Curated annotation (Swiss-Prot):
Tissue specificity note: Highly expressed in brain and testis. Also expressed in white adipose tissue (WAT) and muscle at a low level.
Species: Mus musculus
The name this protein goes by in its record: Rho GTPase-activating protein 33
Induction description: Dramatically induced during adipocyte differentiation.
PROSITE patterns, alphabetized: RHOGAP, SH3
Source species taxonomy: Eukaryota, Metazoa, Chordata, Craniata, Vertebrata
Length: 1305
């Protein structure tokens, strides 16, 4: 019922009349643009129907009332605006532009602000006027990127041409509009005021209809339709429409800024009747309103003042136009001081304020005085000048009054900018200027500040440029004015840059001081770089908002000279993978560094330059200096590369760690080679020469292998690069210098038993594992080793070791450690090395105690992180082979990559020595060897034999091949371990030396080569190539660890006997003789069983012994040995801490097991140790005694099965955490022979104590005295109660010889 009444005949507002269509609507406006009680306005013809409820019937752009058009409106700016974001779209309610009565195209625009939307109608000329106002007062076209609207086209298709243009224009403008719009004409175009409310015209808005009565709410009502009002009890409502007395159901009224209908019974009117003698005002809105029935009138009325004057004043105050109306009509002119800068420049038609122009010209001509802009002038002169400018008159500044008071002119200039309603740098950009100044880097800060300046309104931009150029010119006279750029910035900053938030809360103290600091820094930066910031050539195009380059810049070295710079490992991998067509992981393109960043990186590289050399340079002493060829790669901390998924890397690529671009061209010859993954060495640290240990990380991300370009200098380069014999087979003359020719071509890999080691302290001498046979299927790389993986690798097939290379590639399973690390060498070390390395020394050098060797071996070790350790374990752990392929022992066999060429003749010498700790250790080891030789010569009374080759080092556990003519030449002096009775413990800073097995040395006949693999599948290249497997296939089937070797005379071994573990018996001092062999060489190896229970866990590690020997040839001088090589044992003070080896009884050609750490308990009588010196002299050839250096490996992590959850202690050599004291180092002993075996070790993890030993495996018998073997655990054979194999390969021993250099593991 009520709804039907509400939609009935239209209810005309009181005070309006109409006589059908074409009549006029009269209303009084109460908008803020009109004065209170302003008189009637001009009528506006309505074009809508009778039910329009006050909606506009004519387009809003050209009202025929007091509200002017935009072109006719005086320009003004609001002082404060706060409306937020504004969205502008072409109105979807209209099908398109329509033609008005004046044949103009009219477009509907939907304006959305603060969650409210309304449509406005604008012509194309209005759009062009809006564009002109925007770019005159608000935006610069370089910042807004808005196109200038062209003149309206002519023709019938003009509308279709303009619609896409206006759509794009409004979309771009909506992204720019924020609370930075303070231009009155622009906001009026959108029908907005400065607070985001809709600004309605008086002729069209029902809100502007005057009220006929006031009422208060007595009953709450909730709106049921969009055109209804909701109110609560007690609210005040202005009633604008009241129906006749007989129909009082629905009234219309205003509550706040809302207009709508409401039930009449919900409100009560406030009635007011004039007194009987009071004449009602004709203009009163209550005049002629019949009093509703039921409403009682007031009993008495308040009398009004009488007289003409009061009436006139009252009429004037009601009809007085508002300030805004006067400014719009141009009647009220804004003063200069305190006027918005854009409004003042728009009204005056000038580019910069007249105040700034006059003051700056006067000060530059007459104001070069001390303290300009810092000292204040006379206040009366300042006020007089201000009044002159406000009156739009230009004062005469050249008068004597102002010439005598120049500071008043400078104070006036500062006062003008201080009184701007919006500062010169604007409130809106205060935060952006602060953020731009907080970025690091001068160039990036310059770009960011330049971008913020471009966001200034054009009047502010022009004024700022003029002012800053003036201040920069004044700063050049700082010698006369004492006002340089910083002082000028301090006095000008509060006038140019202010924060509205900080001003509103009125901060003081420290907060105000910080604001002043920010202001002064910004203004000083602008003053310093004014020529660049306001230059027409400077642009930030192609840069992101942070100032970083989006467009790649051309590099000067890219493709111009490939050999002029080094490539990192990542770049080399990316280029090689791209050349082979292998998909790589998507990476974010690196943006070119700015000049400032390049300078910082160059300075950082200069600081790291002392560590850019290699430890191999020790062997190039005396060969002349060379240019360092490698730079230290970043070690994995914050830039750790993610692990690669299985199959994502090519299997047929060989890479070097860091090579020039020129060397990558040689990769094509090795396309069929297996790429070995390398485990890089950690950085070293020394107390004397500190080098910060770098964090460890992924080995997969830095895996690399030796370059396949190290082919033979003979004809067949491709064949020799695939095999192991190629590099040296045809050129024996290069053998001596091949060690020093090209250190980067040396391919070293760690033994498989070194998986997961925390401290890889077998540097500077590195090791290399053999590679898998191509015939065996390659197991897929898995992140974790399977539990049932075998610990015994399979045997390699002979065809895999052919010089022609493998038939097909295999997956890499072994890692290679070859990345050198180095530091600078002080002059004292160089002098020491030079004295030790001179063949003929003028003055005798004192013999240094070999005790210094282990003290200097602590200088190159860094901790690997847990993540890296786990990854190394997963890479080194054996994986299950293909089904059906079992090792002789019945276990699955992991595969290793084939060997790569070891040396390449020719090439530049390695870089000069730069690692003091390693060089010192090698130098002292050499000196100790020389001492031993001299002492041996003095006791024997003979002349020392000339060394066959210069001082050389042990390279690898598995060297690829031996040159022709050198494998069997010369007499190789054997040696035997002779531990002393006293075994001093290591100092606290020495790492704990641990051992998983014995190190074996063998005596062999003259002319035989001593090469021995570490396991069944790790066979040296020259053995495989020589057809060793074809010679004795039946011997290989007898024992899982027996591999035929090259030679004719087999060696005889004695069966080792079992001894008690360390915690069940007291170790006995002394050495024990070796018994006769318990089985013939042709008999199969016996099965050794363990009779003891499970011991506690122990830390796995391995001691690597390096023999630094001297053969026949030229003399090799050095300090004399401090003990006789024919004594039963060296002095106690020289034993057990550095692994000194002595003589071996030659009755049988059997190896000695040197148990480096820990020693086994003694279980043999001392008479077994009786070996007279005369017997040894009779059986011992007069050869110099080799010297062995024991380099220990760091401890492993905690055991998974252990209940202890604490992490392992830091490495003893770590400078950050020295860790707890390490137990004393036991003496080195020989494993006694007997039917018993030491106790098995349950797993690779565990506490450091107690230390258990592995028992020796059945040794293999080969020809030529070559020995190999493996250390079994718990019997070594499955199916005999030994349990499942361990998740890591069992340690194996091997004997390796390269001329006069031998390695044992």
């Amino acid at each position: 019922m009520l709804q039907a009444q509400k939609q009935s005949d239209p209810i005309l507002p009181w005070g309006a009349s109409w006589a059908g269509r074409g009549q006029t609507l009269r209303a009084r406006s109460t908008d803020s643009l009109d004065g209170p009680g302003e008189g009637s306005v001009q009528p506006v013809p309505t074009t809508g129907g009778p039910g329009t409820k006050g909606k506009p019937g004519k387009r809003l752009s050209a009202p025929r009332g007091p509200f002017p058009r935009l072109a006719d409106c005086a320009h003004f700016h609001y002082e404060n605006v706060d409306f937020g974001h504004i969205q502008l779209l072409l109105s979807p309610e209209r099908e398109g532009p329509s033609l008005s009565g004046e044949n103009e195209l009219v477009f509907g625009v939907q304006v959305t602000c603060q969650g409210r939307s309304w449509p406005v109608l604008r012509s194309y000329d209005d759009f062009r006027s809006l564009d002109a106002h925007l770019h005159r007062c608000i935006f610069d076209r370089r910042f807004s990127c808005l196109p200038e609207l062209p003149p309206p086209p002519e023709g019938t298709r003009a509308a279709q041409m303009l619609v896409p243009l206006l759509l794009q224009y409004l979309e771009t403008l909506s992204g720019l509009v924020d609370s930075n719009l303070n231009c009155g004409p622009v906001l009026t175009w959108m029908e907005l005021d400065n607070h985001g409310r809709r600004l309605l015209l008086s002729e069209e808005a029902s809100l502007n209809i005057p009220a006929v009565a006031a009422a208060h709410v007595v009953k709450r009502y909730t709106a049921q339709a969009p055109d209804e009002l909701s109110f609560e009890v007690g609210d005040i409502v202005s009633v604008i429409d009241m129906p006749p007395t007989e129909d009082r159901s629905w009234w219309r009224g205003k509550r706040g800024f809302q207009v709508g209908f409401f039930p009449s019974e919900c409100v009560e009117l406030f009635t007011e009747r004039p007194g009987p003698g009071l004449k009602a005002d004709a203009d009163s809105p209550l005049c002629g309103i019949p009093a509703p029935q039921g409403i009682s009138s007031l009993t008495s009325a308040v009398p009004r003042p009488r007289g003409k004057l009061a009436g006139l004043l009252r009429t004037f105050m009601r009809s007085r136009p508002s300030r805004q109306r006067l400014r719009q009509r141009g009647i009220l002119r804004q003063r200069v001081f305190g006027c918005d800068l854009g409004e003042h420049l728009s009204n005056s038609g000038q580019d910069v304020p007249q105040v700034l122009r006059c003051c700056s010209e006067f000060i530059e001509a007459h104001g070069v005085v001390d303290g300009i802009y810092r000292l204040s002038g006379v206040s009366s002169n300042i006020q007089r000048l201000r009044h002159e400018f406000d009156s739009e008159r230009i004062p005469e500044l050249s008068g004597p009054a102002f010439l005598q008071d120049i500071h008043s002119v400078s104070s006036l200039c500062k006062l003008y900018f201080r009184e701007l309603p919006n500062p010169l740098l604007t409130y809106q950009l205060y935060g952006k200027f602060s953020e731009a100044m907080s970025v690091p880097g001068e160039e990036e800060r310059l770009v960011r500040v330049h971008d913020v300046i471009q966001q200034l309104p054009p009047p502010h931009y022009r004024t700022l440029e003029y002012l800053l150029r003036h201040l920069a010119r004044m700063a050049r006279h700082s010698a006369n004015t004492s006002m340089h750029a910083r002082n000028l910035a301090i006095v000008w900053a509060p006038n140019l840059l202010r924060s509205m938030e900080l001003e509103s809360v009125g901060l003081g103290g420290a907060a105000a001081f910080r604001e002043v600091r920010v202001q002064s820094v910004v203004v000083e930066f602008l003053l310093t770089h004014v020529e660049v910031l306001f230059s027409d050539t400077f642009t930030s195009a192609g840069l992101d908002p942070a100032g970083r380059c989006l467009l790649p810049r051309p590099k000067s070295l890219a493709g111009s000279s490939p050999s002029t710079r080094l490539l990192t490992l990542e770049e080399a991998q990316a280029r090689t993978q791209g050349r082979l067509g292998t998909p790589t992981e998507p990476t974010t393109p690196k943006t070119p560094a700015s000049p400032v960043e390049r300078r910082k990186r160059e300075r950082a590289e200069k600081q790291r330059k002392p560590g850019g050399s290699s430890w191999k340079t020790f062997f190039a002493l005396g060969r002349g200096p060379s240019i360092p060829r490698k730079k230290p790669l970043p070690w994995l901390g914050g830039s750790r590369a993610p692990p690669q998924p299985s199959g994502s890397r090519p299997d047929t690529v060989t890479l070097r760690s860091a090579k020039s671009e020129e060397s990558l061209s040689s990769q094509a010859s090795g396309a069929g080679l297996q790429r070995l993954h390398r485990l890089r060495r950690p950085h070293s640290s020394s107390d004397a020469f500190p080098v910060g240990p770098a964090p460890a990380g992924s080995c997969e991300s830095l895996s690399s292998s030796s370059s396949s370009s190290s082919s033979s200098s003979s004809s067949s380069s491709s064949e020799s690069s695939a095999g192991g014999l190629g590099p040296l087979s045809g050129s024996p003359s290069h053998r001596t210098s091949a060690w020093l020719d090209d250190g980067d071509d040396l391919d070293f890999s760690p033994p498989r038993c070194l998986e997961g080691l925390r401290g890889l302290d077998f540097d500077p001498l590195t090791f290399r594992c053999s590679s898998p046979t191509p015939g065996d299927p390659a197991p897929p790389a898995s992140p974790a080793p399977p539990a049932s993986a075998s610990a015994f690798p399979p045997r390699a097939t002979p065809q895999a070791l052919s010089p022609h290379g493998p038939t097909k590639p295999a997956s890499p399973t072994a890692l290679d450690i070859s990345e050198p690390l180095a530091v600078s060498v002080p002059p004292a070390v160089l002098e020491l090395l030079g004295a030790g390395g001179t063949p003929a020394s003028a003055t005798p050098t004192p013999a240094l105690s070999p005790h210094l060797i282990p003290l200097l071996l602590r200088g190159a070790e860094a901790q690997l992180s847990d993540t890296c350790q786990q990854e190394i374990s997963s890479k080194l752990a054996p994986t299950r082979g293909a089904p059906g392929q079992q090792s002789p022992g019945g276990m699955d066999s992991p595969l290793l990559p084939p060997p790569l060429p070891l040396l390449r003749p020719g090439g530049a010498p390695p870089p000069p020595p730069k690692n003091p700790a390693r060089l010192m250790a090698l130098a002292l080891a050499e000196r100790a060897q020389q001492v031993a030789e001299q002492q041996s010569q003095q006791e024997q009374g003979g002349t020392p034999p000339a060394p066959h080759s210069p001082f050389r080092r042990s390279l690898s556990l598995e060297v690829g091949g031996e040159p022709v003519g050198t494998s069997g030449s010369g007499i190789h002096p054997p040696s035997l371990a002779h531990p002393g009775a006293w075994a001093p413990g290591p100092p606290p800073y020495l790492p704990r030396q641990q051992s998983d097995g014995s190190l074996v040395r063998s005596q062999r006949p003259l002319g035989t080569s001593r090469r021995s693999p570490r396991g069944p599948s790790q066979v040296s290249a020259h053995l495989r190539a020589s057809g060793a497997y074809r010679d004795a296939p039946e011997m290989a089937a007898q024992s899982p660890c027996s591999v035929p070797s090259q030679g004719s005379n087999p060696s005889f071994f004695s069966t080792p006997r079992e001894c008690l573990p360390p915690f069940l018996g007291v170790p006995k001092q002394g050495l024990y003789s070796l018994g006769p062999p318990s089985f013939p060489p042709s008999s199969p190896a016996p099965v050794w069983r363990n009779s003891l229970g499970a011991p506690s866990a122990l830390d796995r590690g391995e001691n690597l012994y390096y023999e630094i020997g001297v053969g026949e040839g030229t003399s090799y001088s050095g300090p004399s040995r401090s003990w006789s090589p024919f004594r039963s044992m060296p002095p106690d003070r020289h034993n057990a801490s550095y692994g000194m080896l002595g003589q071996s009884p030659p009755l049988h050609r059997s190896p000695d097991f040197l148990l480096s750490y820990p020693p086994p308990p003694s279980c043999f009588p001392p008479e077994h140790l009786t070996h007279s010196v005369s017997q040894r002299l009779a059986r011992r050839p007069t050869r110099p005694e080799p010297l062995y250096v024991n380099l220990a490996l760091g401890p492993r992590g905690p055991s998974p099965a252990s209940s202890s959850s604490s992490s392992p202690p830091a490495h003893p050599r770590s400078r950050s955490d020295p860790g707890p004291p390490v137990p004393r180092l036991p003496q080195k002993q020989r494993a006694p022979w007997g039917p018993h075996t030491p106790h098995r070790v349950p797993g690779p993890w565990g506490s450091p104590e107690p230390f258990l030993l592995y028992r020796p495996a059945p040794p293999s018998y080969g020809r030529g005295g070559e020995v190999r073997g493996s250390l079994y655990r718990n019997g070594g054979h499955r199916g005999e109660g030994a349990g499942p194999p361990p998740p890591y390969p069992t340690p194996s021993w091997s004997l390796h010889s390269e001329g006069q250099t031998r390695s044992y593991c």
